[in-house]
Amino acid sequence: MRKGKIAAQASHASLGAILNYGKHLPEVEGKYESVNISLRHQPLSEWLNGRFTKVCLYVNSEQELLDIYNKAMYNKVNVKLIKDAGLTEFNGVPTLTCLALGPDYPEVIDPITGHLKLL
């Protein structure tokens, strides 16, 4: 992917993970609500009010990306997987491009992504 495409896909994943985080909370009932509701949940609150840390890592294939996604789902870690429609890259083929985990504590995320290299 081109650098701009990588940035866009990472932005989609990051925002999607935040929106998913609130979506899975019992009191929100599947709707995207204001961040104020979600701030009652410790990992998200600490992340939003702290350093807002994000790390970009590299995988070698769509399958490796899907494996990370499945591992996150298995461990009940908030995750958002992005599939690009393929309109500007990938020759019109919908392609898995990116995912975001969390926000959560390093001890939750690192066992899933600790083996990956920085982008």
Model feature map: region roles:
Residues 1-119:
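Positively charged, small/polar-rich N-terminal and surface patches that mediate targeting and assembly
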